[in-house]
A protein has these predicted regions:
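Bacterial N-terminal signal peptides that target proteins for export
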Residues: 1-8
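N-terminal signal peptide c-region/cleavage motif recognized by signal peptidases
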Residues: 16-18
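N-terminal "domain-start" segment that seeds a small globular fold
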Residues: 20-48
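Short active-site neighborhood of thiol/selenol oxidoreductases, capturing the structured segment around
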Residues: 53-65
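Typically the conserved alpha-helix immediately C-terminal to a functionally engaged Cys/Sec
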Residues: 71-83
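Thiol-based oxidoreductase modules, predominantly thioredoxin-like and allied folds used
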Residues: 86-101
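Structural micro-motif
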Residues: 110-119
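Non-catalytic, surface beta->alpha helical segment in thiol-disulfide oxidoreductase systems
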Residues: 122-150
């Protein structure tokens, strides 16, 4: 039932004229990577409230602002965005700010209570990667390449 609701939500999002991708991702230049200090939003961009977008792979990062592991994963996220922005839809979910309904659905369905949490969905919404903790960029790039070649 939950999977069906998410798929329906994704279909509606695909056909909705209000479906925009987060764009212009920027890493907060004041991040202290060695501490759990609260340095503000780790990643900023336009339409930061976007959620899943059907039709291409999706990379989702769920993080907290005061987590040094999240800060390091945020840096990797922006590097991946710079390389794959035209091929992959990026979703950034900051647990310290209000979320859109689309983002809240992703948190409810996939977030396991540990940050950072990284999720990669294929173009149809099927999870290809769904883990908490830091993940190296090459692991995600391999998943992107496999998904993009299908």
């Amino acid at each position: 039932m939950k999977k069906t609701l998410l798929q329906l939500s994704m279909l509606l999002r695909l056909t909705s004229p209000a479906s925009f991708a987060i764009d212009n991702l920027k890493l907060n230049s004041n991040l202290n990577y060695g501490s759990d200090s609260l340095d503000g939003a780790l990643i900023t961009g336009s339409d930061a409230q976007s959620g899943f977008f059907a039709g291409k792979p999706n990379y989702v990062i769920i993080y907290g602002e005061g987590c040094f592991n999240s800060k390091r994963q945020a840096r990797r996220t922006v590097e991946l965005y710079d390389k794959y922005r035209s091929q992959v839809h990026f979703v950034v979910i900051d647990l310290d700010v209000p979320r859109s309904p689309e983002q809240q659905q992703l948190v409810k369905q996939y977030y396991k209570g540990y940050i950072p949490h990284v999720l990669v969905l294929d173009a149809h919404g099927t999870p290809l990667y769904n883990q908490s903790g830091e993940v190296e960029s090459r692991v995600i790039e391999d998943i992107f390449q496999k998904s993009l070649s299908q």
